[in-house]
Every structure is written in structure tokens, then in C-alpha cells.
Amino acid sequence: MVTSRTWFTAKQKVELWERWKNGHARGVLKKELTAQLRTRRQMRHAKGVKAKNGQGHILDMVSIRERPAEAEDRAVPGHWEGDLLTGASDTHIVTLVERHSRFTMLVKLPRKDTTTVVAALAKHIRKLPEQLRRSLTWDQGKEMSGHKRFTVTTNVQVYFCDPRSPWQRGSNENTNGLLRQYFPRGTDLSRFSQAYLNVIALRLNQRPRKTLAFETPANRLQLVLH
């Protein structure tokens, strides 16, 4: 039986997600499984392809299936996962997680249109050393319809996840869950400065992670830079 004290491995969480997705978790079981999510939220319905869900056809998308093996197995640093954390009144923060180290960057976002998103992302990515600028994986949100402009500006290729496949950005999804401790649902995210977002990112980057043998993301990233 699943109880409020039950803990799951990352693999088990993926399996639970599959049960939700396939409609196999109902009634009491669904409530119990929901309690296991760090944010205590119901199943996140993956964004569909309809424009009303913030999705639409993106020209010249490159599929995640074409992403290099070095990104898939996390062997080489510089491959990022990205998403938007959503708050009240259609406010957003860009969340970026480096796959090798789980290092997190947060980007203040005044608006969600693709011009604003691409410009904000490019500004932060260009500050990184060249070896940390290899690829970016995103879902099929229309905010990244300007991905070609982003690639030209940063020389970072964007790969798009399959529809309804949040586990293809698993590190980013997990980090967004951690961030809800600081930015609960219903929070107006526009009131936070970039300086404050940097402080929160630093807290996450200095937190030991089991998946890194209890090393911190900050330390892991420093190792690859020296």
C-alpha cells in the first residue's frame, strides 16, 4: 500500500507517472500517489499540441531522438534541459538544468512571447564557458518557436521532446518540483528580481544530491571546468 511515508526512487516515480498517464491510478490509489509528489500536486497534464495549451506547430524542430549520445548518457557537460515555471497572472521564470551536474540557472522573464524568451535565454547562455554550451532540450511550447534565432545567437542546438513526455526532461522536472518550495503555485513570479533568483539557484546548487553520490551540483560543475 502507498502511504504518506512511502518514498520512491526516480525509476519508480517514472513508473507511477506511466500509471497515471495510462489511467490506471484511480480513486484512493490516485490520492495516495498524488501525496508522494514533492509539490503535492495532481498529475501534471502534459502540454498538448493545441495552441490553447501554449503549444503549436514549431517550424524546423529537431527531435530529441537526434540528440547526441553524449547528452543522453550525461557523460559530457554542457547539455541543458529547460522549461518555464508558471505562477499567478501568467507570470513565468525560465528554469535551466545542466544534465551532467544538475547545476541550475533561473532567468527572470517579463513576458512569455518567443522574442522575450529567446533573448533572455541567449543572454544567460552566452555568459557560460564554451564547453558548457552544447545543447538545450525543451518541450514543444510555442515560447521556443524562435529556436533558430537562439541557435544562431548562441551556437547551441535546441532539441524538442516528444508530446506528452515530461520525463524526457527529467532533471528539469525534478528541479521544478524543488523550486516549488520557494515559489508555491499561485505566486506572482514577476515580483522576484534576477538577484533573488540567483540566490535561490545557489541554494539548489549547494544542496548535496543522492544522484551525484551526495556531491553538490556546484562542486560537480567546478570539477569539469578545471
Report each predicted region and the residues it spans.
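Short conserved beta-strand segments at catalytic cores or DNA/RNA-binding microdomains
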Residues: 72, 85-105
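Mobile genetic element proteins and their domesticated derivatives, centered on retroelements
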Residues: 16, 83, 96, 102, ...
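Two-metal-ion RNase H-like nuclease active-site motif
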Residues: 77-86
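Short, amphipathic alpha-helical "recognition" segments used to contact nucleic acids or chromatin
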Residues: 8-25
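Acidic/histidine-rich, metal-coordinating catalytic segments
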Residues: 130-144
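Charged alpha-helix within mobile-element recombinases
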Residues: 126, 141, 148-226
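Basic, flexible linker segments flanking DNA-binding modules
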Residues: 31-72
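Active-site beta-loop-alpha junctions of metal-dependent nucleic acid enzymes
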Residues: 86-89, 106-130
